């Protein structure tokens, strides 16, 4: 059986590589270095199950990226994974039902694995 696909968007290459290496046996991880690339990857891979995005990125931030994802893919389960606690963004994400979780970097492997597994059964 094929591994579930997750998309991880982050403007820092080291974070992309780390998440990909961490979960290479659990998920098929598709990475993108920008929100624009993330939207392209979603168009190319409609079977992506979970979308994880950094918050602070140039051009389009993570929440705006997730808003774009949800416009065309309301069924996608989205999460923010960030080094910044921004309560207003977190509240907007939850109140508008844009995000499933708001997680902090550095991530804990077991916590992130469990969260993605929860997202897959939604």
Predicted regions and their residues:
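Active-site beta3 strand of CheY-like receiver
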Residues: 46-52
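C-terminal output helix
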Residues: 107-116, 120
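Two-component/phosphorelay signaling modules centered on CheY-like receiver
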Residues: 13-31
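Helix N-cap/capping motif at the beta->alpha junctions
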Residues: 11, 31-40, 62
């Amino acid at each position: 059986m094929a591994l579930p696909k997750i998309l991880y968007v982050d403007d820092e290459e080291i974070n992309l590589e780390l998440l990909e290496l961490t979960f290479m046996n659990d998920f098929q991880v598709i990475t993108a270095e920008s929100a624009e690339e993330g939207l392209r990857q979603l168009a190319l891979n409609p079977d992506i199950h979970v979308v994880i995005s950094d918050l602070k990125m140039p051009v389009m931030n993570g929440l705006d990226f997730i808003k774009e994802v949800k416009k065309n893919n309301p069924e996608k389960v989205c999460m923010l994974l960030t080094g910044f606690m921004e309560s207003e963004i977190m509240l907007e994400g939850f109140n508008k039902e844009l995000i499933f979780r708001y997680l902090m970097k550095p991530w804990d492997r077991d916590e992130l694995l469990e969260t993605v597994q929860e997202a897959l059964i939604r």
